[in-house]
Design a protein with these regions (language model features):
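N-terminal carbohydrate-binding accessory modules
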Residues: 1-2, 22
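Phosphate-binding active sites in nucleotide-utilizing proteins
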Residues: 5
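Substrate-binding/catalytic cleft of secreted carbohydrate-active enzymes
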Residues: 8-191
Length: 191
């Protein structure tokens, strides 16, 4: 990845095998690590409407006590498991509202558990007052962002562009992307 010019990877709502973090430590790759979300996801509420700048709600229904406990215990175990990996410089609690609940209290709890890392309470939208950074996702329109307050501003997701190249496709029947390009030149020009 470094040979391609990348110095940071975001592990999006999943954990990797130990070897991944070891190699990132060894080669100096920065990791933004999401906690694994456990909660309801609604495409319209959590993705479609916020992507174009709207919101149906700023708070989500509280998950069951079992789900809340699972998120808390799994998050604590994740922090203990990954604590000695210096490649991880930032943790994200919730992505785009997926399973988001009790954000301020959870931010304070996990930040107290590991104050050595930067904490992103909500990546994308449904932001809270408690977070070390302001995280934005931009898929349509220009990549213009405006800081709110004094927190660092991060663009943590963008683009969604695709170009189906022969010999570089996993699924030959479907192509995913918000904006699709038919040639390498057209694709590179859009970036």
């Amino acid at each position: 990845m470094k040979d391609l010019g990348f110095n940071t990877l975001r592990k999006h709502i999943k954990l990797e095998p130990e070897r991944f973090y070891y190699d990132c430590d060894r080669y100096g790759m920065i990791v933004f690590q999401d906690l694994v979300n456990s909660g309801p996801y609604h495409y319209l509420r959590d993705t479609a409407i916020p992507t174009i700048g709207g919101k149906l709600a700023t708070y989500h229904e509280a998950p069951s006590e079992r789900r809340r406990n699972f998120f808390l215990i799994h998050g604590e175990e994740t922090l203990r498991h990954l604590y000695n990996h210096p490649c991880i410089v930032l943790y994200t609690l919730f992505n785009e509202g997926w399973g988001q609940h009790d954000t301020q209290n959870l931010y304070r709890h996990f930040r107290a558990m590991d104050p050595s890392r930067i904490w992103n309470a909500a990546s994308g939208w449904f932001k809270n007052s408690d977070s070390d950074v302001q995280s934005e996702h931009i898929y349509f329109g220009s990549l213009r962002m405006k800081a709110q307050g004094r927190r660092p501003l991060l663009l943590t997701e963008f683009g969604g562009y695709s170009c189906a190249l022969e010999g570089h496709r996993f699924n030959l029947d479907e192509e995913y992307g918000y904006q699709k390009y038919r040639s390498r030149e057209e694709f590179q020009g859009a970036l």
